[in-house]
Amino acid sequence: MIEAELKARVRDVESVKAALAARSAGQRSKYQDTYYDLADDRLSSEGRELRLRTITTDNGRRSLLTYKEPTIDTASGSKPEYETEVGDPSVIDSLLRGLDLKVLVGFEKHCINYRFVSEGRELLATLVTVPELDGTFIELETIVPESELAEAMEVVRTTLRQLGIADGDLTTEQYTDAVLATRKASGLP
């Protein structure tokens, strides 16, 4: 399955929140993301991602292990994705480190998730702030077979426009790259 997704900077956060709230109740959550790579950085250099994410909400906590293959749609950055829930993230962290993977970067995301249907597709819209980065972002995604990617991307684009997001606000920059660049510019590891 492919995560058909677009990400954009949000210029008018309150208007976008209101437009999303008209479609669905939002759920606040905190993501703690840790990305891993091989010693030679082969995963990231090939556009692959291996992430351990712990999501904390008012309803509890859960952790997911996600592997993403290289981008198949360069305009959006959409990638094939494989994800599973894990019971104990510390065990997975130990397992990955034991297999000689290293932590590439870890960071926190503060999110509000909205689930709704648009043009017959189940969508997840996430308003995101990363404490280390300036601004607010929106991610809008749906999971589809590769054969439906083009149609799904059009629904995602149209829905973003309906939410007040202009095409010029779209970005393919990854949070991992932005956080690493911010830390480097600040002299942090």
Q: What kind of region is each of these model predictions?
A:
Residues 139, 143-145, 153-161:
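A hydrophobic, small-residue-rich beta->alpha segment in the mid-to-C-terminal subdomain
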Residues 99, 105-146:
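Conserved, surface-exposed functional patches that form binding/active-site neighborhoods
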Residues 1-120, 157, 165-189:
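N-terminal strand-loop-strand beta-hairpin
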Residues 59, 146-150:
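Short, glycine- and charge-enriched coil/turn segments that flank and shape catalytic ligand pockets
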